[in-house]
């Protein structure tokens, strides 16, 4: 019985998407090495023929949490991100502004701010999140259009 459980677990791991196993941050963490996280995301993007979705913000940012909840509740958005992007969170807070990484890209005009990078690290899009909002939430159609519009750079 133990052998069967082990084989089942191994089969499940083999079939699961690769994004499920990398150690990129799920939260904004001022202690993380943002440069290393972005490099890891780029390596994964190259290996998987995807782009990188960089989410810049902080645990202090209400709209950052709204975005996380929005994505978690929208299967179409989750699918678009999982199919075409490696997601990486880069902290911006008084504890760590990650200036070395963020100075390489267009200046953010608020948070969260989204950058799309091709697998070589070139900025394909720099998007203030406010343009993707609708009322007190995000607009699914606007977000999906943003994600799809830049896939040609892949």
Regions found by a protein language model. Name each.
Residues 33-50:
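A short beta-strand-turn-helix
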Residues 77-97:
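Thiol-based oxidoreductase modules, predominantly thioredoxin-like and allied folds used
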Residues 105-115:
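Structural micro-motif
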Residues 61-65, 114:
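The canonical Cys-X-X-Cys-His
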Residues 3-7:
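N-terminal export leaders
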Residues 65-80:
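Typically the conserved alpha-helix immediately C-terminal to a functionally engaged Cys/Sec
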Residues 113-153:
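Non-catalytic, surface beta->alpha helical segment in thiol-disulfide oxidoreductase systems
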Residues 49-59:
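Short active-site neighborhood of thiol/selenol oxidoreductases, capturing the structured segment around
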């Amino acid at each position: 019985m133990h052998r069967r459980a082990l084989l089942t677990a191994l089969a499940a791991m083999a079939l699961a998407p690769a994004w499920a196993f990398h150690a990129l941050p799920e939260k904004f963490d001022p202690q993380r090495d943002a440069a290393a996280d972005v490099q890891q995301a780029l390596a994964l993007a190259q290996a998987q023929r995807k782009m990188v979705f960089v989410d810049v913000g902080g645990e202090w940012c209400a709209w950052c949490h709204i975005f996380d909840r929005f994505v978690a509740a929208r299967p179409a958005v989750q699918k678009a991100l999982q199919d075409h992007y490696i997601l990486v969170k880069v902290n911006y807070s008084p504890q760590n502004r990650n200036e070395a990484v963020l100075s390489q890209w267009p200046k953010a005009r608020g948070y969260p701010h989204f950058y799309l990078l091709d697998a070589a690290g070139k900025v394909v899009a720099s998007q203030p999140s406010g343009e993707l909002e609708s009322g007190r939430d995000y607009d699914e159609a606007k977000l999906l259009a943003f994600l799809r519009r830049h896939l040609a750079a892949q």
